[in-house]
């Protein structure tokens, strides 16, 4: 029974993946761009508000003024 359930779930996943990718090839570039934008980390420029040094592009944050150096 367990083997049948695993085979059924695998078949469902393969069918779903094939169906969803077939009709959405034109959106591939958009999805790729969205994924890249989420992976890219932005840093806070000089004099920007900061709470931790690693948010600043310079990796230095003034704790009293809460500004990047």
Swiss-Prot record:
Keywords (alphabetical) are: Cleavage on pair of basic residues, Disulfide bond, Knottin, Secreted, Signal, Toxin
- Establish whether keyword Amino-acid biosynthesis is in the entry: no
List the cysteine pairs that form cystine: 43-57, 50-61, 56-68
Could you tell me where this protein is found in the cell? Secreted
The molecular function terms of the Gene Ontology recorded here are: ion channel inhibitor activity; toxin activity
Q: Which residues, if any, are the signal sequence?
A: 1-17
On tissue specificity, the annotation reads: Expressed by the venom duct.
Membrane-crossing ranges are: none
UniProt remark on domains: The presence of a 'disulfide through disulfide knot' structurally defines this protein as a knottin.
Instruction: Return the similarity comment.
Output: Belongs to the conotoxin O1 superfamily.
Please identify the protein, giving its name as recorded.
Conotoxin AbVID
What organism does the record attribute this protein to? Answer: Conus abbreviatus
Q: What is the lineage of its organism?
A: Eukaryota, Metazoa, Spiralia, Lophotrochozoa, Mollusca
